[in-house]
A protein has these predicted regions:
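Short, non-transmembrane cytosolic segments of multipass membrane proteins
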Residues: 1-14, 95-105
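Cytosol/matrix-facing amphipathic helices and coiled-coil assembly/linker segments
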Residues: 3-65, 86
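Solvent-exposed, non-transmembrane helices and loops of integral membrane proteins
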Residues: 8-17, 21, 105-132
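Loop-to-transmembrane boundary segments
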Residues: 34, 120-146
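Inner-leaflet juxtamembrane helices
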Residues: 36, 40, 65-122
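Helical transmembrane-bundle signal
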Residues: 49-52, 83-94, 144-149
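Membrane-interfacial hairpin junctions
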Residues: 57-74, 159-161
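Juxtamembrane boundary at the C-terminal end of a transmembrane helix
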Residues: 147-161
């Protein structure tokens, strides 16, 4: 009978097989996290395009539809607020995905340090965020939302009188 914490010789192959399966799972999760960022961006692009198109349709057609200018302006502002909410939601999902990626990569490094040897894989450094595509996805979302609000504030809303 083995003492708790003591490894039996026949347990080493089982342990290595378990580590290999866990490593495969971690790599699959890292791949999924990477794919999800693009799915979230596609979600943002689709919803933002639809909402901004509705705002532009409201801007172009509010007179023909006999809407009061104040009502049309409120509609444009409401649609842009929805775009902002979608952008915030998408940004949150991207940030959470990046944090998950860091966690999975650290777990990957733990496994390789134990099974292969220390330093086999270097740990990710959050200071390298300028090399992460998530950084630029977030910048794109931020710049696009700011641009939409500025275009509405300086061109659309003043023209709706």
């Amino acid at each position: 009978m083995a003492v708790p914490g003591e490894t039996r010789p026949e347990a080493a192959p089982v342990r290595n097989e378990f580590a290999l399966e866990r490593y495969r799972y971690i790599l699959q999760q890292i791949h999924t996290v990477n794919e999800n960022a693009y799915r979230f961006l596609a979600l943002y692009q689709t919803l933002a395009t639809a909402l901004v198109s509705a705002a532009l349709a409201l801007f172009v057609g509010y007179r023909k539809w006999d809407l009061a200018p104040a009502t049309a302006r409120g509609g444009v502002i409401g649609l842009l607020a929805l775009v902002t909410v979608v952008a915030a939601f998408t940004s949150t999902l991207i940030v959470v995905g990046a944090l998950n990626w860091l966690d999975y990569r650290n777990e990957e490094c733990d496994i390789t340090d134990e099974v292969v040897g220390p330093g086999f894989r270097t740990r990710p450094r959050p200071g390298n965020f300028l090399r992460w595509y998530e950084t630029y996805l977030l910048l794109f979302i931020l710049v696009s939302v700011i641009a939409m609000w500025l275009i509405a504030a300086f061109f659309l809303l003043p023209a709706m009188r």
